[in-house]
């Protein structure tokens, strides 16, 4: 039987958090997080049943406030515990049971340095050393955690205003963050006294998201608040975009570089479109996307599978779709 190219899962709630498991032995497993205006929210782990062609909820848990991000541990070969991280009021780590049918809270990480807890806006898990995880907060700080000890390795004031997103480069030393002050800043864990401003938006429009190209770590992508364009940056040439991707008709909500290719990136937007771009002709202007997919509603989120790079997941309203590209 030939596999379908699109599978859909309908959730009982609006989906915001979305992450594709990196484990090779769990190829069609994802985590989805709710966006409800109540205190009690939810995260479900869903798995495609390849016999019935349907997604099934295999386990899940209640979560205080909507999770700002969900992410599986980058562990393709199952060498580590089967962990899922979420952020919201705190950073939490959840462990899936060996039967795959249960998931429990493993640890709640709090920084003893701070007296109160400011909401965490995002985080990233280091692929080279999965004991490292970095969180960003609306209190202007970023924190690097050692998840094995449960301790903060370092906390730094990263921006002048709220920090909205954080991402590691390939390797264990470099990370970058974006925030409400309109800057993208790069840090080196070996020398946190200094940061490099890679880009600042004209008139300091907030930058909401960033994504680091793992195949060619010279390149980053970022998006501005309420903007239909995607900014591609080259860290060797700060302050001037290497390219601008202008095709979406409404605000871009998510960006993801291809896990297996240095020159492909996917972008999703309120215009209901998911676009894949080929950037191999840079520095020539990139006029049009390579592939276009039209969803039924504004696309809030995407996740590109690292274990099967020909699959991308998107979330719109209460629907999750996985698309073969």
From Swiss-Prot:
Gene3D superfamilies, per the entry: YVTN repeat-like/Quinoprotein amine dehydrogenase
Keyword Repeat found: yes
InterPro entries the UniProt entry points to: DCAF7-like, WD40/YVTN_repeat-like_dom_sf, WD40_repeat_CS, WD40_repeat_dom_sf, WD40_rpt
TM region positions: none
One Pfam family this sequence matches: WD40
Family: Belongs to the WD repeat DCAF7 family.
Protein name per the record: DDB1- and CUL4-associated factor 7 homolog
């Amino acid at each position: 039987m030939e596999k379908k190219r699109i599978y859909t899962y309908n959730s009982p709630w609006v989906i915001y958090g979305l992450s594709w498991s990196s484990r090779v032995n769990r190829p069609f497993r994802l985590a989805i997080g709710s966006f409800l205006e109540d205190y009690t929210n939810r995260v479900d782990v869903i798995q495609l049943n390849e016999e019935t062609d349907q997604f099934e909820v295999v386990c899940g848990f209640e979560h205080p406030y909507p999770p700002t991000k969900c992410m599986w541990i980058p562990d393709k070969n199952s060498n580590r515990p089967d962990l899922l991280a979420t952020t919201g009021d705190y950073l939490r780590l959840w462990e899936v049971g060996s039967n795959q049918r249960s998931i429990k809270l493993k640890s709640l990480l709090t920084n003893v340095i701070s007296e109160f807890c400011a909401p965490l806006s995002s985080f990233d898990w280091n692929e080279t050393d999965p004991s490292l995880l970095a969180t960003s907060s609306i209190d202007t700080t970023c924190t690097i955690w050692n998840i094995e000890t449960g301790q903060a390795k370092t906390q730094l004031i990263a921006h002048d205003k709220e920090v909205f997103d954080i991402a590691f480069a390939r390797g264990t030393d470099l990370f970058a963050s974006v925030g409400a002050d309109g800057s993208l800043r790069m840090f080196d864990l070996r020398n946190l006294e200094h940061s490099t401003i890679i880009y600042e938006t004209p008139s300091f429009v907030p930058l909401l998201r960033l994504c680091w190209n793992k195949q060619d770590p010279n390149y980053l992508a970022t998006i501005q608040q309420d903007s239909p364009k995607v900014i591609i940056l080259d860290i060797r040439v700060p302050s001037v975009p290497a390219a601008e991707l202008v095709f979406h008709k409404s605000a871009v909500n998510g960006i993801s570089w291809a896990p297996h290719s240095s020159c492909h990136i996917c972008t999703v937007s309120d215009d209901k479109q998911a676009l894949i771009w080929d950037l191999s002709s840079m520095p020539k202007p990139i006029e049009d996307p390579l592939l276009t997919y039209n969803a039924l509603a504004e696309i809030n989120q995407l996740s590109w599978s690292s274990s099967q790079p020909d699959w991308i997941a998107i979330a719109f309203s209460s629907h999750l779709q996985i698309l073969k590209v």
